Regions:
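Outer-membrane beta-barrel porins/channels
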Residues: 20-44, 110-297
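Bacterial Sec-dependent N-terminal signal peptides
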Residues: 1-24
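Single-residue recognition of alpha-helix boundary sites
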Residues: 13-14, 74, 184
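N-terminal, post-signal peptide beta-strand-biased segments of exported outer-membrane/organellar beta-barrel
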Residues: 18-125
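Residue-level detector of alpha-helical transmembrane segments in integral membrane proteins
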Residues: 7, 57, 270-271
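Hydrophobic alpha-helical membrane-insertion segments
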Residues: 11-12, 54, 72, 189
Length: 297
């Protein structure tokens, strides 16, 4: 009980630490952002292998059916921190980016015989980017200069976070099923700003925002087929329910002309424009004596 309370307090304290984005990539500007791996330390050591992974000393949140394998004598707590170093190149130019983030906090324990539970905090998507481009254009409204320079700046932040509670059971020998029930929250703020060196040309700023408060359901199944006394194969299947997030994204367009001292703001809103897709996963893991594993998802 004391271990469970301690892990719960650590999970709650990590909610504030997880407020910032865990990426620095222009690809995160699309949709709800870049999808997070959501895998634990052992799974990442096997390049993200998860759907058929079934261990008694590891929490595998990507397939809740695996919770039924948790050891009855141990309480598992796992937390991860990531450091991202990326280099982007385009048109002979390059830029480096570094990002550090609290990746996940998960815990798991056996509740009854062949029944295990897990809870934790995971990132679902990450939004984080900041880049710009500029060029010269012919023609200008200003009588002082026949040419002008424009600059387009793109930036965004936030993402979606996920806190979950899951249970896995083995109702039949070698067959396990499980479910994760999650609460999703977060959103995004994205900016596109067009500025010109010519003060007579309008500066245009577009701000895209959305706030999400919704749920997520993930189902899992695992079947283990013994091959010998030391060898076995585990097949894993997962399904995540797709549904509307009931979110209303907004676009705010601000036109500003410093020379004429004129500003104008227009706002647009689209109802129920964001959805979670239906997702499916399948994987298999071959294990020899609990020491050698080979698998694919």
């Amino acid at each position: 009980m004391k271990k469970t309370i301690t892990a719960s307090l650590l999970l709650l304290s990590s909610l504030g630490l997880h407020a910032q984005s865990g990426t620095n990539s222009p690809y995160s500007q699309y949709g709800l952002g870049e999808l997070s791996e959501q895998s634990g330390s052992f799974s990442r050591g096997m390049n993200g292998l998860a759907y058929g992974l079934r261990l008694n000393n590891q929490v595998n949140a990507l397939n809740p059916a695996s919770y039924s394998a948790l050891d009855s004598l141990s309480f598992i707590f796992d937390a991860g921190v990531s450091l991202q170093m990326t280099q982007f190149k385009e048109g002979g130019r390059s830029i480096s980016a570094r990002n550090a983030d609290l990746e996940y906090v998960v815990a798991g324990l056996r509740l009854f015989r062949h029944v295990g539970v897990s809870f934790g905090l995971l990132p679902y998507t990450n939004v984080g980017y900041d880049y710009s481009n500029s060029a010269h254009i012919n023609g200008s409204l200003s009588p002082e200069s026949p040419t002008a320079t424009y600059n387009n700046k793109y930036s965004g932040s936030q993402g979606l976070h996920q806190v979950y509670l899951g249970v896995g059971a083995e109702p039949l020998r070698n067959l396990s099923v499980g479910v994760n029930a999650s609460y999703l929250w977060g959103g995004y703020t994205k900016y596109v700003t067009n500025t010109y060196s010519d003060a007579y040309v309008n500066t245009l700023q577009r701000t895209y925002t959305a706030e999400v408060r919704s749920y997520k359901l993930d189902f899992g199944l695992q079947y283990t087929q013994p091959l010998s006394a030391k060898d076995q194969v585990t097949l894993g299947l997962t399904y995540s329910l797709g549904h509307s997030l009931n979110a209303d994204p907004e676009l705010s367009v601000i036109k500003n002309n410093s020379q004429l001292a004129v500003a104008d703001t227009t706002r647009f809103r689209i109802s129920n424009a964001l959805d979670l897709p239906h997702t499916f996963g399948v994987g298999a893991v071959y294990s020899h004596n609990g020491q050698l594993m080979v698998g694919a998802d």
